[in-house]
């Protein structure tokens, strides 16, 4: 599989993603947004950062880029697409996934390791885990609060499209374990089909043993 890691002006996690994927044996390379996606692309990561300085809303400007239209077209053809942090914001703004990511309830940038509970282990992104598994994955965001209206949230849950929820080390979903005030403590969801996903935590920062955590390997392993 050849994975394109899309870089916008302000992206800063693209090389991290490439290195993490390479560690898993995946052929990955950075694709500058103005150049479009390589013809042989059969996987896409939209990485973290601050595309276009987060002006208007985080991810709003990048979502209008022509390369995102290419990503949508590939997603429609069944190509796996993962948006991480700013990439998750872009994905929601572009309609690849439901909801939106807004300012943290704390109104602060938060950079820390958190725990995630696997809610659905039947997707490509979670097939390496079992339902209820607890992962330790870092976050680093100021606008990571997942928000969605009540009816859409009910549909999301009913359709089993929640991938991860923030939890404590024992797997309990509590207010204290929800770092940003996300609706339902949601940390990641799928699009209309489960080969498209967005998540706020950074699996690429929990893939290399040298980083002290490897729980993210199973997520990025969907591209392997």
Curated annotation (Swiss-Prot):
GO terms for molecular function: ATP binding; glutaminase activity; phosphoribosylformylglycinamidine synthase activity. Its main location: cytoplasm. Residues 2-224 form the Glutamine amidotransferase type-1 domain. It is found in: Cytoplasm. It catalyses: N(2)-formyl-N(1)-(5-phospho-beta-D-ribosyl)glycinamide + L-glutamine + ATP + H2O = 2-formamido-N(1)-(5-O-phospho-beta-D-ribosyl)acetamidine + L-glutamate + ADP + phosphate + H(+); L-glutamine + H2O = L-glutamate + NH4(+). The keyword Cell membrane does not apply. Pathway: Purine metabolism; IMP biosynthesis via de novo pathway; 5-amino-1-(5-phospho-D-ribosyl)imidazole from N(2)-formyl-N(1)-(5-phospho-D-ribosyl)glycinamide: step 1/2. GO terms for cellular component: cytoplasm. Keywords: ATP-binding, Cytoplasm, Glutamine amidotransferase, Hydrolase, Ligase, Nucleotide-binding, Purine biosynthesis. Its EC number is 6.3.5.3, 3.5.1.2. SMART domains: GATase_5. The active site is at residues 85, 202, 204. The keyword Thylakoid does not apply. Gene3D superfamilies: 3.40.50.880. Part of the phosphoribosylformylglycinamidine synthase complex involved in the purines biosynthetic pathway. Catalyzes the ATP-dependent conversion of formylglycinamide ribonucleotide (FGAR) and glutamine to yield formylglycinamidine ribonucleotide (FGAM) and glutamate. The FGAM synthase complex is composed of three subunits. PurQ produces an ammonia molecule by converting glutamine to glutamate. PurL transfers the ammonia molecule to FGAR to form FGAM in an ATP-dependent manner. This is Phosphoribosylformylglycinamidine synthase subunit PurQ. It comes from Halobacterium salinarum (strain ATCC 700922 / JCM 11081 / NRC-1) (Halobacterium halobium). The gene is purQ.
């Amino acid at each position: 599989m050849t994975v394109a890691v899309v870089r916008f002006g302000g992206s800063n996690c693209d090389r991290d993603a490439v290195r993490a994927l390479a560690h898993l044996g995946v052929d990955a390379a950075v694709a500058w947004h103005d150049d479009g996606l390589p013809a042989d692309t059969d996987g896409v990561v939209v990485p973290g950062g601050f595309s276009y300085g987060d002006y208007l809303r985080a991810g709003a400007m990048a979502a209008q880029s022509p390369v995102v239209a290419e990503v949508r077209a590939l997603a429609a053809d069944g190509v796996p697409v993962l948006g991480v942090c700013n990439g998750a914001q872009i994905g929601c703004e572009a309609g690849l996934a439901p909801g939106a990511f807004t300012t943290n309830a704390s109104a602060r940038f938060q950079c820390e390791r958190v725990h995630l509970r696997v809610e659905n282990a039947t997707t490509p992104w979670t097939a390496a885990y079992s339902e209820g598994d607890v992962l330790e994955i870092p976050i680093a965001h100021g606008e990571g609060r997942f928000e969605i209206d009540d009816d859409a949230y009910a549909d999301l849950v009913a359709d089993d499209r929640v991938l991860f929820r923030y939890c404590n080390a024992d797997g309990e979903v509590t207010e204290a374990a929800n770092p940003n005030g996300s609706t339902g403590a949601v940390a990641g969801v799928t699009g209309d089909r489960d080969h498209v996903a967005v998540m706020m935590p950074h699996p690429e920062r929990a893939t290399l043993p040298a980083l002290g955590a490897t729980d993210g390997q199973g997520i990025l392993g969907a591209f392997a």
